């Protein structure tokens, strides 16, 4: 990745782990960024991002990768976000927020929802559910609400590396839309 300039040497990131097999390659960096390459998918994640993608190198890395391999037929691009939301009794909060009272309510353990919104060239899928997570200020796993968003856009041009880079460049716009939507849904 450094040789091709996908992860520039000037960032001084050390590789903490690599896995390389014919169908799968994974590179984990000390910065918290992981690059996963499968036959039909490139995924770049950053585990150390808080408050949006503004300080993350994910879009820059993914854009550099597709520029290095412009001959690949890219069919879609996605910006994905995850938030952990603390609430007292997350299961009860979601049941009260999204489910009408009735006899079905009493024996129900949890409520999870999936919402799908149209985008110009794709769709936004927003999933809200409960789960457990290790929070920075807590020693044990805590019950939380987990929100996952996938802004998926279809590529229509070939070569499409420029279109993929354009879609990846919408990360901050997508984050703002996600934050606003999640705030409106959860409050």
Label each residue range with its predicted role.
Residues 45-85:
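Aromatic- and glycine-enriched beta-alpha-beta binding-site module
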Residues 1-9, 58-66, 95-98, 158-173:
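Surface-exposed flexible segments
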Residues 124-187:
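Mixed-charge, glycine-accented linear interaction segment located at domain edges/termini
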Residues 88-148:
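Aromatic/basic-lined ligand-recognition segments
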Residues 18-19, 68-88, 105-120, 175-187:
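Short glycine-rich, low-complexity/disordered patches
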Residues 41, 47-53, 85-87, 151-163, ...:
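A generic structural motif
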Residues 27, 32-41, 45-47, 55-60, ...:
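Amphipathic N-proximal alpha-helical interface segments
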Residues 1-47:
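N-terminal low-complexity, intrinsically disordered segments
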């Amino acid at each position: 990745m450094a040789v091709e300039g996908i992860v520039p040497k000037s960032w001084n990131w050390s590789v903490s782990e690599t896995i390389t097999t014919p169908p799968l390659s994974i590179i984990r960096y000390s910065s918290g960024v992981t690059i996963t390459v499968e036959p039909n998918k490139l995924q770049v994640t950053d585990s150390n991002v808080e408050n949006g993608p503004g300080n993350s190198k994910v879009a820059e890395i993914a854009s550099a990768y597709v520029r290095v391999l412009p001959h690949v037929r890219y069919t879609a691009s996605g910006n994905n976000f995850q938030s952990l939301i603390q609430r007292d009794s997350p299961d009860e909060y979601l049941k009260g927020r999204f489910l009408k009272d009735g006899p079905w309510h009493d024996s129900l353990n949890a409520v999870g929802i999936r919402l799908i919104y149209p985008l110009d060239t794709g769709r936004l899928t927003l999933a809200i559910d409960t789960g457990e997570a290790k929070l920075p200020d807590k020693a044990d796993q805590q019950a939380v609400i987990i929100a996952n968003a996938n802004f998926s856009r279809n590529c229509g041009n070939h070569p499409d590396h420029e279109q993929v880079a354009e879609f990846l460049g919408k990360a901050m716009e997508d984050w703002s839309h996600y934050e606003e939507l999640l705030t409106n849904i959860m409050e």
